[in-house]
Amino acid sequence: MLEKSFTEVYDKFKLQFYRKVFELVRERDGSLSAMEAFSLEVIKMLDHPTIGQFADFLNISQSNATYKVNNLIKKGYLERENSTTDRREYHLKLSEKFYNYMALLSSYEQRVMDRIKARFSEEDVNKFDEMLQIISNELMPEFGK
């Protein structure tokens, strides 16, 4: 029962995300491809990674990662930020253009959050939040906190 319910909710969020990505992906100069949109999501979740960290996470070559990153920089979705500890290294920073794009994608998540708060008691919402934090921080250690 739990597995089925979890999978249904997770799949619905994925479907909504994919729908929005493909709505935003256009065949014109400067638009994002689906792969670029997913790459930006990974960079966001890795929180200012280096190109090496990005490549390692996706299990792709450094040159392939560099190619993807350079395209995203050209399109204005990504910026390079020099490392404070090693001037030869830089971190990937998401641009304002990316956050404008993300606002369109996250509207569904906010709608679901509003529905949760309207449907359940404050106590239930707080318990659900606590459970989600435990799941994220303790039960999914391979992705850090």
Write out the residue ranges for each language-model feature.
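N-terminal leader segment of winged-helix/HTH proteins
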Residues: 1-30
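C-terminal regulatory/oligomerization modules of transcriptional regulators
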Residues: 1-4, 122-145
